[in-house]
Amino acid sequence: MKGILNALYHQKDLNDEEVKRLFTFIINEEVSPTQLGAILCALKIKGESLSEISAAATTLLEHAPKPFKSGLDLIDNCGTGGDGLKTINISTIAALIASSMGLPMAKHGSRSVSSHSGSADLLENLGVNIEMNRAQLENCLKESHFGFLFAPLYHQSFKKSAPLRKELFTKTIFNCLGPLINPLRPTIQLLGVYDESLCKTMVLALKALGVKRAMVVNGGGTDEIVLHAITHACELKNNEILEYDLSAKDFNLPPYDLKELQIESVQESVQACLDILENKGKDSHTMVVVANVASLLYLSNRAKDLKEGVSMTLEHLKTKAPYTHLQKIIRLSHA
Protein backbone atom coordinates (compact mmCIF):
# COMPACT_ATOMS: atom_id res chain seq x y z
CA MET A 1 0.00 0.00 0.00
CA LYS A 2 2.84 2.39 0.85
CA GLY A 3 4.39 1.90 -2.60
CA ILE A 4 1.06 2.54 -4.33
CA LEU A 5 0.48 5.71 -2.33
CA ASN A 6 3.99 6.98 -3.04
CA ALA A 7 3.52 6.39 -6.77
CA LEU A 8 0.28 8.37 -6.70
CA TYR A 9 1.84 11.17 -4.65
CA HIS A 10 4.48 11.48 -7.38
CA GLN A 11 1.68 11.52 -10.00
CA LYS A 12 2.73 8.25 -11.59
CA ASP A 13 0.14 6.04 -13.31
CA LEU A 14 -0.39 2.66 -11.67
CA ASN A 15 0.03 -0.49 -13.74
CA ASP A 16 -2.75 -3.09 -13.99
CA GLU A 17 -1.33 -5.25 -11.21
CA GLU A 18 -1.05 -2.30 -8.83
CA VAL A 19 -4.62 -1.24 -9.60
CA LYS A 20 -5.85 -4.79 -9.01
CA ARG A 21 -4.06 -4.96 -5.65
CA LEU A 22 -5.33 -1.52 -4.66
CA PHE A 23 -8.97 -2.26 -5.41
CA THR A 24 -8.73 -5.70 -3.84
CA PHE A 25 -7.54 -3.93 -0.67
CA ILE A 26 -10.50 -1.54 -0.94
CA ILE A 27 -13.00 -4.37 -1.52
CA ASN A 28 -11.61 -6.35 1.44
CA GLU A 29 -11.68 -3.23 3.66
CA GLU A 30 -7.93 -3.35 4.17
CA VAL A 31 -7.69 0.40 3.57
CA SER A 32 -8.45 2.94 6.29
CA PRO A 33 -10.81 5.85 5.57
CA THR A 34 -7.81 8.22 5.72
CA GLN A 35 -5.89 6.13 3.20
CA LEU A 36 -8.91 5.82 0.92
CA GLY A 37 -9.43 9.58 0.97
CA ALA A 38 -5.75 10.09 0.12
CA ILE A 39 -5.93 7.54 -2.72
CA LEU A 40 -9.05 9.06 -4.28
CA CYS A 41 -7.69 12.61 -4.06
CA ALA A 42 -4.27 11.61 -5.42
CA LEU A 43 -5.89 9.82 -8.36
CA LYS A 44 -8.12 12.83 -8.96
CA ILE A 45 -5.23 15.32 -8.95
CA LYS A 46 -3.05 13.09 -11.15
CA GLY A 47 -5.92 12.29 -13.48
CA GLU A 48 -7.22 8.73 -13.77
CA SER A 49 -5.77 6.99 -16.83
CA LEU A 50 -7.71 4.74 -19.20
CA SER A 51 -5.75 1.69 -18.05
CA GLU A 52 -6.39 2.52 -14.37
CA ILE A 53 -10.13 2.91 -14.94
CA SER A 54 -10.34 -0.30 -17.00
CA ALA A 55 -8.28 -2.34 -14.51
CA ALA A 56 -10.31 -1.05 -11.55
CA ALA A 57 -13.58 -1.90 -13.31
CA THR A 58 -12.33 -5.38 -14.20
CA THR A 59 -11.33 -6.01 -10.57
CA LEU A 60 -14.69 -4.85 -9.22
CA LEU A 61 -16.56 -7.03 -11.74
CA GLU A 62 -14.46 -10.06 -10.78
CA HIS A 63 -15.48 -9.64 -7.14
CA ALA A 64 -19.15 -8.81 -7.78
CA PRO A 65 -21.83 -11.52 -7.46
CA LYS A 66 -23.12 -12.70 -10.82
CA PRO A 67 -26.95 -12.41 -10.80
CA PHE A 68 -27.73 -14.69 -13.77
CA LYS A 69 -27.18 -15.04 -17.50
CA SER A 70 -30.07 -13.45 -19.33
CA GLY A 71 -29.20 -14.61 -22.84
CA LEU A 72 -30.20 -11.13 -24.08
CA ASP A 73 -28.23 -8.25 -25.55
CA LEU A 74 -28.85 -6.09 -22.50
CA ILE A 75 -28.74 -2.30 -22.55
CA ASP A 76 -27.75 0.15 -19.81
CA ASN A 77 -27.86 3.93 -19.77
CA CYS A 78 -26.21 4.58 -16.43
CA GLY A 79 -24.28 7.85 -16.17
CA THR A 80 -21.42 9.01 -13.98
CA GLY A 81 -23.51 11.62 -12.17
CA GLY A 82 -21.49 14.36 -10.57
CA ASP A 83 -22.53 17.20 -12.88
CA GLY A 84 -24.14 19.00 -9.92
CA LEU A 85 -26.89 20.55 -12.08
CA LYS A 86 -29.80 18.87 -10.26
CA THR A 87 -31.96 17.99 -13.25
CA ILE A 88 -34.83 15.54 -13.54
CA ASN A 89 -33.81 11.88 -13.86
CA ILE A 90 -33.55 11.90 -17.64
CA SER A 91 -31.76 8.57 -18.09
CA THR A 92 -33.97 6.64 -15.66
CA ILE A 93 -37.18 7.91 -17.24
CA ALA A 94 -35.71 7.11 -20.67
CA ALA A 95 -34.93 3.56 -19.50
CA LEU A 96 -38.51 3.04 -18.33
CA ILE A 97 -39.90 4.21 -21.68
CA ALA A 98 -37.36 2.20 -23.69
CA SER A 99 -38.26 -0.96 -21.77
CA SER A 100 -41.95 -0.35 -22.54
CA MET A 101 -40.92 -0.38 -26.21
CA GLY A 102 -39.30 -3.79 -25.81
CA LEU A 103 -35.67 -2.84 -25.24
CA PRO A 104 -34.10 -5.05 -22.52
CA MET A 105 -32.91 -2.42 -20.03
CA ALA A 106 -30.64 -3.55 -17.19
CA LYS A 107 -30.35 -0.28 -15.29
CA HIS A 108 -27.39 -0.05 -12.90
CA GLY A 109 -27.56 2.81 -10.42
CA SER A 110 -27.51 4.12 -6.89
CA ARG A 111 -28.67 6.97 -4.71
CA SER A 112 -27.73 10.55 -5.41
CA VAL A 113 -24.43 11.99 -4.26
CA SER A 114 -24.49 15.41 -5.96
CA SER A 115 -28.11 15.86 -7.08
CA HIS A 116 -31.55 15.84 -5.46
CA SER A 117 -32.52 12.53 -7.02
CA GLY A 118 -30.46 9.57 -8.22
CA SER A 119 -31.92 6.65 -10.16
CA ALA A 120 -32.49 4.63 -6.99
CA ASP A 121 -34.16 7.59 -5.27
CA LEU A 122 -36.58 8.08 -8.16
CA LEU A 123 -37.46 4.41 -8.61
CA GLU A 124 -37.92 3.84 -4.87
CA ASN A 125 -40.27 6.83 -4.62
CA LEU A 126 -42.21 5.54 -7.61
CA GLY A 127 -42.78 2.30 -5.69
CA VAL A 128 -40.22 0.06 -7.39
CA ASN A 129 -38.36 -2.41 -5.18
CA ILE A 130 -34.76 -1.27 -5.74
CA GLU A 131 -33.31 -4.20 -3.77
CA MET A 132 -34.70 -7.04 -5.87
CA ASN A 133 -33.27 -10.46 -5.15
CA ARG A 134 -31.94 -12.64 -7.95
CA ALA A 135 -35.28 -14.30 -8.73
CA GLN A 136 -37.19 -11.00 -8.67
CA LEU A 137 -34.63 -9.30 -10.90
CA GLU A 138 -34.57 -12.13 -13.42
CA ASN A 139 -38.36 -12.32 -13.57
CA CYS A 140 -38.82 -8.54 -13.79
CA LEU A 141 -36.33 -8.30 -16.63
CA LYS A 142 -37.90 -11.24 -18.44
CA GLU A 143 -41.50 -10.05 -18.09
CA SER A 144 -41.09 -6.27 -18.36
CA HIS A 145 -37.74 -5.80 -20.12
CA PHE A 146 -36.63 -3.72 -17.12
CA GLY A 147 -34.39 -4.64 -14.24
CA PHE A 148 -32.74 -2.38 -11.68
CA LEU A 149 -29.41 -3.35 -10.16
CA PHE A 150 -28.79 -1.29 -7.02
CA ALA A 151 -25.01 -0.79 -7.08
CA PRO A 152 -24.40 -1.09 -3.30
CA LEU A 153 -25.92 -4.60 -3.34
CA TYR A 154 -23.32 -5.80 -5.82
CA HIS A 155 -20.38 -3.59 -4.95
CA GLN A 156 -19.95 -3.20 -1.20
CA SER A 157 -17.01 -0.83 -1.71
CA PHE A 158 -19.44 1.69 -3.20
CA LYS A 159 -21.76 1.43 -0.22
CA LYS A 160 -19.03 1.61 2.40
CA SER A 161 -17.12 4.45 0.75
CA ALA A 162 -20.19 6.60 0.03
CA PRO A 163 -20.04 8.75 3.21
CA LEU A 164 -16.34 9.46 2.70
CA ARG A 165 -16.79 10.26 -0.99
CA LYS A 166 -19.58 12.68 -0.16
CA GLU A 167 -17.30 14.50 2.30
CA LEU A 168 -14.62 15.00 -0.38
CA PHE A 169 -16.91 17.38 -2.32
CA THR A 170 -15.47 16.27 -5.65
CA LYS A 171 -15.86 13.65 -8.34
CA THR A 172 -13.64 10.59 -7.93
CA ILE A 173 -12.74 7.48 -9.90
CA PHE A 174 -15.88 5.89 -8.41
CA ASN A 175 -18.00 8.20 -10.60
CA CYS A 176 -16.27 6.77 -13.67
CA LEU A 177 -16.52 3.19 -12.43
CA GLY A 178 -20.27 3.12 -11.71
CA PRO A 179 -21.40 2.86 -15.36
CA LEU A 180 -18.68 0.29 -16.16
CA ILE A 181 -19.46 -2.34 -13.55
CA ASN A 182 -23.01 -3.50 -14.23
CA PRO A 183 -22.87 -7.15 -13.08
CA LEU A 184 -25.14 -8.24 -15.95
CA ARG A 185 -22.50 -7.00 -18.42
CA PRO A 186 -24.71 -5.20 -20.97
CA THR A 187 -23.47 -5.25 -24.55
CA ILE A 188 -25.01 -1.88 -25.46
CA GLN A 189 -24.55 1.31 -23.42
CA LEU A 190 -25.55 4.95 -23.54
CA LEU A 191 -23.24 6.51 -20.97
CA GLY A 192 -23.29 10.11 -19.81
CA VAL A 193 -20.17 11.69 -18.29
CA TYR A 194 -19.86 14.82 -16.15
CA ASP A 195 -16.95 16.21 -18.21
CA GLU A 196 -16.56 16.25 -21.99
CA SER A 197 -12.88 15.32 -21.65
CA LEU A 198 -13.94 11.89 -20.36
CA CYS A 199 -15.95 10.91 -23.46
CA LYS A 200 -13.05 9.33 -25.36
CA THR A 201 -11.58 7.66 -22.27
CA MET A 202 -14.87 6.11 -21.24
CA VAL A 203 -15.83 4.81 -24.68
CA LEU A 204 -12.40 3.15 -24.90
CA ALA A 205 -12.95 1.67 -21.42
CA LEU A 206 -16.30 0.24 -22.54
CA LYS A 207 -14.62 -1.26 -25.60
CA ALA A 208 -11.88 -2.79 -23.42
CA LEU A 209 -14.55 -4.32 -21.17
CA GLY A 210 -16.28 -6.03 -24.10
CA VAL A 211 -19.19 -3.69 -24.83
CA LYS A 212 -20.11 -3.97 -28.52
CA ARG A 213 -22.13 -0.81 -29.15
CA ALA A 214 -21.98 2.40 -27.17
CA MET A 215 -22.33 6.15 -27.11
CA VAL A 216 -20.63 8.26 -24.43
CA VAL A 217 -22.01 11.77 -24.13
CA ASN A 218 -21.71 15.10 -22.35
CA GLY A 219 -24.40 17.63 -23.09
CA GLY A 220 -23.76 21.20 -22.05
CA GLY A 221 -21.95 20.10 -18.90
CA THR A 222 -24.53 17.43 -18.00
CA ASP A 223 -24.11 13.67 -18.14
CA GLU A 224 -27.03 13.42 -20.57
CA ILE A 225 -28.01 14.09 -24.16
CA VAL A 226 -29.60 17.55 -24.02
CA LEU A 227 -31.46 20.00 -26.23
CA HIS A 228 -30.34 23.26 -24.60
CA ALA A 229 -26.73 22.97 -25.77
CA ILE A 230 -24.37 20.94 -27.94
CA THR A 231 -23.95 17.32 -26.88
CA HIS A 232 -20.49 15.91 -27.52
CA ALA A 233 -20.58 12.19 -28.37
CA CYS A 234 -18.09 9.38 -28.83
CA GLU A 235 -19.74 6.38 -30.46
CA LEU A 236 -18.48 2.79 -30.57
CA LYS A 237 -19.70 1.17 -33.78
CA ASN A 238 -18.25 -1.78 -35.67
CA ASN A 239 -15.24 -1.72 -33.35
CA GLU A 240 -14.41 1.86 -34.35
CA ILE A 241 -14.74 5.13 -32.44
CA LEU A 242 -16.70 7.98 -34.05
CA GLU A 243 -16.56 11.44 -32.48
CA TYR A 244 -19.10 14.18 -33.24
CA ASP A 245 -21.42 16.84 -31.85
CA LEU A 246 -25.21 16.71 -31.66
CA SER A 247 -27.70 19.57 -31.45
CA ALA A 248 -31.48 19.69 -31.10
CA LYS A 249 -31.70 19.81 -34.92
CA ASP A 250 -30.18 16.33 -35.17
CA PHE A 251 -33.26 15.04 -33.34
CA ASN A 252 -35.66 17.30 -35.22
CA LEU A 253 -36.61 18.80 -31.85
CA PRO A 254 -36.68 22.40 -30.59
CA PRO A 255 -34.13 23.65 -28.03
CA TYR A 256 -35.11 24.26 -24.40
CA ASP A 257 -33.47 26.08 -21.51
CA LEU A 258 -31.50 24.11 -18.89
CA LYS A 259 -33.40 25.86 -16.09
CA GLU A 260 -36.57 24.11 -17.21
CA LEU A 261 -34.99 20.75 -16.35
CA GLN A 262 -33.78 21.63 -12.87
CA ILE A 263 -35.61 20.48 -9.75
CA GLU A 264 -35.52 21.06 -6.01
CA SER A 265 -36.55 17.64 -4.69
CA VAL A 266 -37.02 13.98 -5.52
CA GLN A 267 -40.78 14.56 -5.35
CA GLU A 268 -40.50 16.96 -8.28
CA SER A 269 -38.62 14.35 -10.27
CA VAL A 270 -41.24 11.72 -9.44
CA GLN A 271 -44.04 13.99 -10.65
CA ALA A 272 -42.11 14.87 -13.81
CA CYS A 273 -41.61 11.17 -14.49
CA LEU A 274 -45.28 10.27 -14.02
CA ASP A 275 -46.39 13.18 -16.20
CA ILE A 276 -44.02 12.17 -19.01
CA LEU A 277 -45.13 8.52 -18.88
CA GLU A 278 -48.77 9.64 -19.10
CA ASN A 279 -47.92 11.93 -22.04
CA LYS A 280 -48.83 15.09 -20.14
CA GLY A 281 -45.36 16.27 -19.15
CA LYS A 282 -43.86 19.67 -19.80
CA ASP A 283 -42.50 19.84 -23.34
CA SER A 284 -39.02 20.66 -22.05
CA HIS A 285 -39.04 17.53 -19.87
CA THR A 286 -40.62 15.20 -22.40
CA MET A 287 -38.49 16.17 -25.38
CA VAL A 288 -35.12 15.76 -23.67
CA VAL A 289 -36.20 12.31 -22.48
CA VAL A 290 -37.42 11.49 -26.00
CA ALA A 291 -33.99 12.41 -27.39
CA ASN A 292 -32.37 9.95 -25.00
CA VAL A 293 -34.85 7.16 -25.81
CA ALA A 294 -34.24 7.81 -29.51
CA SER A 295 -30.53 7.29 -28.93
CA LEU A 296 -31.20 3.94 -27.25
CA LEU A 297 -33.37 2.87 -30.20
CA TYR A 298 -30.59 3.91 -32.58
CA LEU A 299 -27.87 2.06 -30.65
CA SER A 300 -29.97 -1.11 -30.53
CA ASN A 301 -30.70 -0.90 -34.30
CA ARG A 302 -34.41 -0.42 -33.71
CA ALA A 303 -34.25 2.97 -35.45
CA LYS A 304 -32.12 3.75 -38.49
CA ASP A 305 -31.22 7.18 -37.10
CA LEU A 306 -31.98 9.57 -34.24
CA LYS A 307 -34.85 11.32 -36.00
CA GLU A 308 -36.65 8.05 -36.63
CA GLY A 309 -36.08 7.15 -32.97
CA VAL A 310 -37.73 10.42 -31.94
CA SER A 311 -40.78 9.75 -34.15
CA MET A 312 -41.13 6.22 -32.79
CA THR A 313 -40.93 7.43 -29.19
CA LEU A 314 -43.41 10.28 -29.62
CA GLU A 315 -45.94 7.91 -31.20
CA HIS A 316 -45.43 5.42 -28.37
CA LEU A 317 -45.96 8.08 -25.70
CA LYS A 318 -49.34 8.94 -27.21
CA THR A 319 -50.57 5.47 -26.21
CA LYS A 320 -49.69 6.15 -22.53
CA ALA A 321 -48.34 2.58 -22.48
CA PRO A 322 -45.23 3.65 -20.52
CA TYR A 323 -47.38 4.57 -17.50
CA THR A 324 -49.14 1.19 -17.51
CA HIS A 325 -45.75 -0.43 -17.99
CA LEU A 326 -44.41 1.27 -14.86
CA GLN A 327 -47.23 -0.28 -12.81
CA LYS A 328 -46.20 -3.68 -14.17
CA ILE A 329 -42.57 -3.08 -13.20
CA ILE A 330 -43.61 -2.04 -9.68
CA ARG A 331 -45.70 -5.20 -9.26
CA LEU A 332 -43.04 -7.54 -10.65
CA SER A 333 -40.27 -5.99 -8.55
CA HIS A 334 -42.14 -7.01 -5.38
CA ALA A 335 -43.35 -10.42 -6.61
UniProtKB/Swiss-Prot annotation:
Catalytic activity, reaction form: N-(5-phospho-beta-D-ribosyl)anthranilate + diphosphate = 5-phospho-alpha-D-ribose 1-diphosphate + anthranilate
> What are the leading ranks of the lineage?
Bacteria, Pseudomonadati, Campylobacterota, Epsilonproteobacteria, Campylobacterales
The protein's enzyme class: transferase
List positions binding anthranilate 1: 79
- What cofactor does this chain's UniProt record say it requires? Mg(2+)
Name under which the protein is recorded: Anthranilate phosphoribosyltransferase
By its UniProt entry, which SUPFAM superfamilies does this protein fall under? Nucleoside phosphorylase/phosphoribosyltransferase catalytic domain, Nucleoside phosphorylase/phosphoribosyltransferase N-terminal domain
Give the domain of life: Bacteria
Q: Which residues bind Mg(2+) 2?
A: 223-224
Q: Say if the entry is tagged with keyword NADP.
A: no
